């Protein structure tokens, strides 16, 4: 049981003063379940987070894929995270 690398999405629109991030990861829990951890907010802030727990990895991956699809549909794009840029929430 290992965690999958997080998916980091960003949405920027200077005309609307918008700079947002959305991080989605699938991680094992201490109880043998899987958690989809979502972390979001304005770039430069600590943001908010929420966890959803699932009994099996396939269900957690499906939930993660659903959130990624919704966010990409709203204009979020992939952001490549270099180790030096990683937000503290990902370390």
Regions found by a protein language model. Name each.
Residues 1-6, 78-91:
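Intrinsically disordered, low-complexity and often Lys/Arg-enriched segments
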Residues 50, 62, 86-90:
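Alpha-helix boundary/capping detector
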């Amino acid at each position: 049981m290992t965690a999958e690398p997080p998916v980091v999405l960003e949405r920027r629109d200077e005309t609307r003063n918008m700079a947002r991030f959305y991080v989605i990861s699938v991680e094992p829990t201490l109880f043998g379940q899987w958690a989809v951890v979502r972390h979001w907010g304005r770039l430069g802030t600590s943001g908010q987070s929420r966890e959803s727990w699932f009994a099996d990895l396939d269900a957690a991956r499906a939930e993660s894929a659903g959130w990624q699809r919704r966010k990409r549909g709203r204009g979020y794009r992939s952001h490549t995270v270099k180790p030096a840029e990683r937000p503290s929430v990902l370390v």
